[in-house]
Amino acid sequence: MKAVLTCFRPVVASHRRYCANPGQAMKYLNVAEKNDAAKTIAGLLSNGAAQRREGYSVYNKVFDFEAPVRGQNAKMVMTSVSGHMMQLAFQVSYKNWRTVDPRSLFDAPVKKGVGSDYEPIKRTLEREVRGCQGLIIWTDCDREGENIGYEIIDVCRAIKPNISVYRATFSEITTVAVRRALQQLGQPDKRQSDAVDVRTELDLRTGAAITRFQTMRLQRLFPEKIADKLISYGSCQIPTLGFVAERYKEIEAFVSEPFWKIKVLHTIDDLTVEFNWARNRLFDKEACENYLLLCLAEPDPRALVESVTVKPKHKWRPTPLDTVEMEKLGSRKLKLSAKETMTIAEKLYTKGFISYPRTETNQFSKEFALAPLVEMQTGHRDWGAFAQRVIEWGPNPRNGNKSDQAHPPIHPTKLAENLQGNEARVYELVVRHFLACVSKDAVGSETLVHIDIAGEKFTANGLVIHERNYLDVYVYDKWSAKQIHHYENGQRFEPTEVSLHEGATTAPPLLTEADLIALMEKHGIGTDATHAEHINTIKERGYIGVLDKGFLVPGVIGMGLYEGYDAMELALAKPQLRAEFELDLKLICQGQKDPKVVLTEQIAKYKQAYQQITDKITAMDAKISARINETPAANSAVQEGADGSAPSHGIIQSIFQCPKCNEAPLALKPKKNQQGWYIGCNNFPDCKNAVWLPTECKDASVLDECCPTCGDGYRMLKFRLSTPYYRGVFGTPSGWYKTCLPCDNLFRTTFNINLDSVKKVGGIVGEVRGGGGGPGPGPGGGGSGRGAGSGGWSSGPGGGGSGGGGGSGGWGSGTGGGGSGGWGSGTGGGGLGGGKGKKPGGESKKSATKKPPNEPKPKKTKEPKAAPNKKTSSKSSGSIRSFFTSAAPTNSASNGLDEFFDSNDGFEDAMLAAAESVESSSQPKTISMVPLDDDIAAAFAADDDAEFEALVNGGTMPTESNGDQQLDKSLSEWIKEQDKADERPMLWGTRERASLGTAAPTPPPKPAAKRPRWDSVERDSTPPSSVPESETVLCTGCQQPARQNTVRKNGPNLGRLYYKCPKPDECNFFQWADEPPSSAKSKNSTGSAPQSTTSWGSNRVVTLPSIQQSNSQRGQSSMRSNSSSTVTITQTKTKQQERNTATPGDGEEVMCNCGQLASQLTVRKDGPNQGRPFYACPTREKSCGFFKWGDEDQNQGASSTSWGSANRNPPGRSQPTAITSDGPKTRRCGLCRKEGHTRNKCPRKDEFDM
């Protein structure tokens, strides 16, 4: 143990040296809100030793110094921003006023990004943060400052995601305050930042929507007076305008009334005392005259003094200064606007002369040190003496009742004697107010004298000031003494004058900025920090004006807007709506409300208000017209939309939510050349999802009608088809076609529109999203989710895919569930897509929507389920013919194209019937699935080993359903007689099938084996090969079991299996897994029938992917399978033309196997066989399986069939293309394996990237 500890000690020591790194000091990036603040803070922390250098912004310098942080010396880099660095804005798609419906701005995506003017600041932060280990935020300690701090954090963490972030909390920029903040670093408050984000987004959405609507409308209606004006709306601006407009309307509506009152005067030695009538005034002159006659009834009227009262009187000193009071004092005493006052105060704060000017607190805490601040002012020539008196009294502030728990009241932080202009005036106001609030009240005495004349009461008062106290320094308050004669109780005197005086009522005065700020604070409009901004904004808009004496009057347009909102009975002009929102913001800061919930609720309220505006907009038109004296334009009613909005021509029309970004809707937009249409995401450029409509679609528009299948939010698309061919395809003789892209499979297939561009489909892009089947000779598992599930990669029954589509019958043979039949033989389900499985005997269910009785219950998925369009459901049910062929003229004379495409001609049944006798192991029983999380694991959950053994050994299967009793007879007999499928590759065709019957004698039956189970852990196995599973491939050099590998390199052999030497010092052994060894080849060449050749692919056996491939490989294979339902083979133009013109027999009738005249059809699907004629059974319901190419020699028979056989490429594998001698090889895409483009320009590149 001692030896162990001895060895462990140096490791611990080295670890401590690595972690602590005491030789290197920490380096912090400090960021302030303004350059002046950064300069001052750097100077205070460094004792004036900070070194200045330039940043990318010429207005924001960088300062380097050292300072102790939490007891350890650290390197400091101080810089600054210039207020908000990021701006919230709509995406580019919403910038054009004329093409965007204002209503859509309530839900349009917004993005917060750094403005172009602030890029140099951003670059400075990015450069400096790279060499720092910590970030300290020194912005103002309020909501806005916290939000600016998080903007800084976002920029810095984009460069260094794990950087430590700290918050410096301070209320003044003094040496004591900033050093204390540096030693008591905290964390930023995300709640305050969230409150600002909510307010910013709501103001942006509501302001932009209503502003655009009323601006475009009023400009159109009144082109002479408002053509070039912006008629803006703001949730704080309009209520603020309402206060001014209401006062102005009160004055307009005021009617003056005359009144009369009795006045009594008593003069002694040039001192006149006026006694006020207890009745004040009367509006009835006759009654007032009667009272006067009553007082004068006696020839010598005498006044009797009833009481003389003397009581002390105090004039209260002011409470500490907060932001609102400073703005009001600046307006009333300094005649400065609120905006000017706040701008000057912020400058004084950044220079360190006063504390933070944005505060709601008007009380000093008991712990606040007032004496040093007062003593600091004793050296001033104007108020230094009074400050000394306050020191002698002891500072005693008169506190108010408000506190924001963040900042103290506004107070001076240091003496300033060299300020000039308005800065000196504002600084003087702050200092005098501070000294006054911590001094004493003024003290005096008030005398009240009550007299009686003939029963009428009169009163006079006087004031004597004993101690002025705070009035000596606070020159903004006046308290004048009022002298009065000496009176005693019971004294009688003769009044000098008793007379009747006439007056009239006057209207209330216009509002001043101080009055307006008081009203905004009372009703909760804005905050102490935003009052000045709101007032200044409506001034700049021209909604209000300022008269010479500072009185505010509404402008012409401002009054029209207020009256218009009032006529519409709209709450937007009232303060209640905004006051509720301001209260919610406070609750967000306190953590009592969710920001997202508040934003959603407020947007819903403003949506209702917007709807009310559009419904009653004519009321505003009338009010605006009356105020500006202009008649609305005559043609405006014709041009405007139904809701009073601008003309809809050119408006971008939203269709449904983008499935890729889920942040903005897809919208119908004209192409740049105005020659067509496309559907693009409004979240561009962040989302580049787009669907380019073909040129055949003319006059496209978006209907208000929603899709009945997809539901609300999915609007229908309407356009006119320009060509007769597509009119016939879609069954619209008039050419007008209405569709919903997510559920119209026919439209997407016809014009090659990717499903994932219009619908959220999940990880594997495409319609077929089933899971894979089982490995080896087991039954295939059903795929979960919408789309078809693939069956087993090898033999075994294919399980039906749960959800909207069926499962393919398996890459080998098998009894398929619903969906497409297998690429091999067996009783696989017929048709691509959602067709039901084929009954024994070649019967196929026509219905595409009804599930098989034994289909497993679908597994729930998150993807939205969209049923197919009713108009195209039958066409998407799985008929191969509906995709590749159209009826010949002889058969389509009585039936239109619509009827033909809606029919099931049994072509897929013919293909499956022709492949029934392929030699592959199959099991005539569909194993029920249990829904599991893993689709493949669900397919192999059932323990069916006993059934599998009984099937392979020819035993009897237990009867469980009617479907089990209707097994294909030929398949059952073949299973009992032979087991050659394990020795030979699976082929699909006619001549190959015939050759298999005579190639070799039937080997003895093999002992039954347990079905291999799928390993849920190890999935990196390989596809099945031509080598039987019971045999082991030995290396020819070392005679050891060879190692099986898969080709990973892109090319014609991608995914192909091969064997090589397993030893590290490999020998030269190599063998393809899907090709027999050289001995087998030579034996086959001498003893077996020759293999037939077809025009599809090469002659070699095609290998198939294993069920145990990785998920990514299986996803790519599925995508390749979805992209092409047939194999693309390079053909020369000459041979293609020869096939199109050659017909067998030149007029001879072709009969099918059931004795009827065969139907002559033509391949319509794009591909090497497009336009090629062929014959098939005319019976669509019960096809005999007859098929024959029309351009091939009759003597060739079925051996020349290009459908099926092992030459056909299975989905998911990229096979070498057969190149004819008549033409060169055409280059293909490395992703989708189609010609005409490369992988860089592949239209499906995004699918394969996933």
Swiss-Prot record:
The keyword RNA-binding does not apply. Residues 189-610 form the Topo IA-type catalytic domain. GO terms for molecular function: DNA binding; DNA topoisomerase activity; DNA topoisomerase type I (single strand cut, ATP-independent) activity; zinc ion binding. Residues 769-835 have a biased composition (Gly residues). It is an enzyme of class 5 (isomerase). The active site is at residue 356. GO terms for cellular component: mitochondrial nucleoid; nucleus; RecQ family helicase-topoisomerase III complex. Releases the supercoiling and torsional tension of DNA introduced during the DNA replication and transcription by transiently cleaving and rejoining one strand of the DNA duplex. Introduces a single-strand break via transesterification at a target site in duplex DNA. The scissile phosphodiester is attacked by the catalytic tyrosine of the enzyme, resulting in the formation of a DNA-(5'-phosphotyrosyl)-enzyme intermediate and the expulsion of a 3'-OH DNA strand. The free DNA strand than undergoes passage around the unbroken strand thus removing DNA supercoils. This is DNA topoisomerase 3-alpha. The lineage of its organism: Eukaryota, Metazoa, Ecdysozoa, Arthropoda, Hexapoda. The gene is Top3alpha.
